[in-house]
Amino acid sequence: MKELEEKIKEYGTVLPGNVLKVDAFLNHQVDPQLMLHIGQKFAKLFANEGITKIWTVESSGIAPAVMTGLEMNLPVIFARKHKSLTLNQNMYTADVYSYTKKTTNRISISKKYVDADDKILMIDDFLANGQAVEGLLEIADQAGVQVAGAGIVIEKSFQPGAGELKERGIRVESLARIQSLSDNKVEFVKD
């Protein structure tokens, strides 16, 4: 997605450890127009899949997931990372390791909002090692729901996440695919 790549070039910052900081438009300050276009793109890519719900992990996946849900006229469920006093029973859970934060979080989705005949689309801001998507897949397995695929805003193609998901038969659609973050420079995969 050209517009997204331009935003990354203009506002993205490469940090040590192959970290790409995009807090100017995605995961701190949010560019609503860009998120709308991202939602439209995912809606188009997954239009004929019979999807019933959009799933993501809080918090950076929420904006693109909500815009995708808006475009597809579908509810969005975000897996919570922190325990809630109001959501404490009848939960599907999975442990997810965060590459950038170097912590493990237990994510959870209430069984109340998951139906046995659901077909879900997972949306996430980044795909590097695939831990967030793996956590959602674990919850999908627990719930017995179908998975249409994963819509990823930014994929770090030089890390194993996308390849491992594709090997498992998971459809992965990434809007910006990064080949390298070497020398503090973002290089995109050339299609």
Swiss-Prot record:
The keyword Membrane does not apply. One of its GO terms (biological process) is XMP salvage. Its main location: cytoplasm. Keywords: Cytoplasm, Glycosyltransferase, Purine salvage, Transferase. 5-phospho-alpha-D-ribose 1-diphosphate binds at residues 128-132. Its EC number is 2.4.2.22. Pathway: Purine metabolism; XMP biosynthesis via salvage pathway; XMP from xanthine: step 1/1. One of its GO terms (cellular component) is cytoplasm. GO terms for molecular function: xanthine phosphoribosyltransferase activity. Xanthine binds at residues 20, 27, 156. It comes from the Bacteria. It is found in: Cytoplasm. Gene3D superfamilies: 3.40.50.2020. It catalyses: XMP + diphosphate = xanthine + 5-phospho-alpha-D-ribose 1-diphosphate. Converts the preformed base xanthine, a product of nucleic acid breakdown, to xanthosine 5'-monophosphate (XMP), so it can be reused for RNA or DNA synthesis. Homodimer. Belongs to the purine/pyrimidine phosphoribosyltransferase family. Xpt subfamily. This is Xanthine phosphoribosyltransferase.
